[in-house]
Amino acid sequence: MPMGINAARKMEDDWKKLRWSDPHYCRRALGLKVKADPLGGAPRARGIVLEKVGVEAKQPNSAIRKCVRIQLIKNGRQVTAFCPGDGAIGFIDEHDEVVVERIGGRMGRSMGDIPGVRFKVVAVNNVSLEEMVSGRKEKPVR
């Protein structure tokens, strides 16, 4: 590598080539996070419920976490979303329109003992799921 007084441009060019060996730079420069993301970089997305599924919790816990399988409206991708709250799955039926957001696990991954689930249901038919679980609002009839 040149080290002279006029070597700045050559050093900069070399560094720009070298950056492509850094996986973090590659993912950022090529926009791979947004491409791989089912929500397409958005904080929330709407989807249609395909089915209700029970996901077994990881060891040492023993439970069946109530989740729903959803097809996103914007791109047709299918994701699994967790239904937070006691009895929340009762407010969700097949073919309902739900709003999902990321579940908040580290590095965009799943959270806690729910394997492979990266999203959670926030609203059903444009009514907050939290409000329905607490009893403050009722689910609208479509």
Swiss-Prot record:
Record's keyword terms, sorted: Ribonucleoprotein, Ribosomal protein, RNA-binding, rRNA-binding
GO CC, one annotated term: small ribosomal subunit
Superkingdom field: Archaea
InterPro entries attached to this UniProt entry: NA-bd_OB-fold (IPR012340), Ribosomal_uS12 (IPR006032), Ribosomal_uS12_arc (IPR022863), Ribosomal_uS12_euk/arc (IPR005680)
GO annotation terms (biological process): translation
Gene3D superfamilies, A to Z: Nucleic acid-binding proteins
Keyword flag RNA-binding: yes
GO terms, molecular function: rRNA binding; structural constituent of ribosome
A matching Pfam family: Ribosom_S12_S23
Subunit description: Part of the 30S ribosomal subunit.
Main function: With S4 and S5 plays an important role in translational accuracy. Located at the interface of the 30S and 50S subunits.
HAMAP family, per database record: Ribosomal_uS12_A
Sequence similarity: Belongs to the universal ribosomal protein uS12 family.
PANTHER family from the UniProt entry: 30S RIBOSOMAL PROTEIN S12 FAMILY MEMBER (PTHR11652)
Designated name of the protein: Small ribosomal subunit protein uS12
